[in-house]
Regions:
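Residue(s) in the substrate-gating loop at a strand-loop-helix junction
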Residues: 143
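C-terminal helical subdomain
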Residues: 183, 204-236, 240, 247-249
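Active-site helix of classical SDR
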Residues: 123, 159, 167
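Short, small/polar-rich loop/turn modules that mediate ligand/substrate recognition or access, typified
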Residues: 83, 175, 180, 185, ...
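Substrate-binding pocket helix/loop in short-chain dehydrogenase/reductase
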Residues: 98-100, 107-109, 210
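Short C-terminal tail/terminal secondary-structure segment
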Residues: 97, 230, 241-261
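Alpha-helical segment proximal to the catalytic Tyr-Lys
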Residues: 128, 172-176, 238
């Protein structure tokens, strides 16, 4: 029996990267999964992977920054699977790499809409179902960029710092309810959102240096974040609440430096 057997879960940003890895991991451990993404094609691939492995999943194409869409996929989970036990608000965007003084208000609004308002809407619409049941796990993807300066672009970093505060506030709002709210703060993970970083390093012949600023001396992989998400989703994390967990190879544990050798 898997650690999520019988649970109903929603994973946003499930078309690739961390979201896909987490949706697959949840299904492997017995959850019925609603996979959400803006890309119908990518979602179809994720759901096919889950089905091929013997899991249960349905796809919902939706924009997490649209409240009606979020309400819709939460309702779809309840209708299809009979309830909601876990929601992983993972979908996010990086924005562009423009210098701070050249960034537009529109850029900030879009990054905040997806990265911060999206998790807020997931909490807003999922929590009432969990509160009525007296249990549930809400997980949000923040970032090491929300903990340490210079780990991400300005609007991205600000949005992820906001997610950490949102999680802490929500956990205390749902005091003594059985509903837990936590965040995962990934470091440099090899996903679509970091593809440009890896592509630039490859073009310069410095791909082997990626991740050298953390003590583990390498970048992370999506499944390593999915494993943390699985723990937080499971009953094994029953006493874990209101926390933001760096999964970054140790990057946030110290000041960056370039090791010798």
């Amino acid at each position: 029996m898997g650690s999520l057997t019988g649970k109903r879960a929603i994973v946003t940003g499930a078309g690739s990267g961390i979201g896909r890895a987490s949706a697959r991991r949840f299904a492997e451990e017995g959850a019925s999964v609603v996979a959400v993404d803006v890309s119908a094609e990518a979602l179809a691939q994720t759901v096919a992977m889950i089905a091929d492995a013997g899991g249960t999943a349905m796809a919902v194409t939706a924009d997490v920054g649209d409240e009606d869409a979020v309400a819709g996929f939460v309702a779809a989970c309840v209708e299809e699977f009979g309830g909601l036990d876990v929601i992983y608000a993972n979908a996010g965007i990086s924005g562009d790499g423009a210098p701070l003084l050249e960034q537009s208000v529109e850029l900030w609004q879009e990054v905040l809409r997806v990265n911060l308002i999206g998790p807020f809407l997931c909490i807003k619409h999922a929590a009432p179902i969990m509160l009525a049941a007296g249990k549930g796990s809400i997980i949000c993807t923040a970032s090491v960029a929300g903990i340490r300066a210079n780990a991400g672009g300005t609007p991205y970093s600000a949005s992820k710092a906001g997610v950490i505060s949102l999680v802490q506030t929500a956990a205390n709002t749902f005091f003594n309810s059985g509903v837990r709210v936590n965040a995962i703060c990934p470091g440099l993970i090899q996903t679509g959102i970091t593809k440009s970083t890896f592509d630039r390093a490859k073009a310069r012949g410095t791909e082997g240096k990626i991740g050298q600023l953390n003590p583990t001396r390498r970048p992370g992989q999506p499944n390593e974040i999915a494993n943390m998400a699985l723990f937080l989703a499971s009953d094994e994390a029953s006493y874990v609440n209101g926390q933001a967990f760096p999964v970054d190879g140790g990057l946030s544990s110290t000041h960056p430096f370039v090791p010798r050798g």
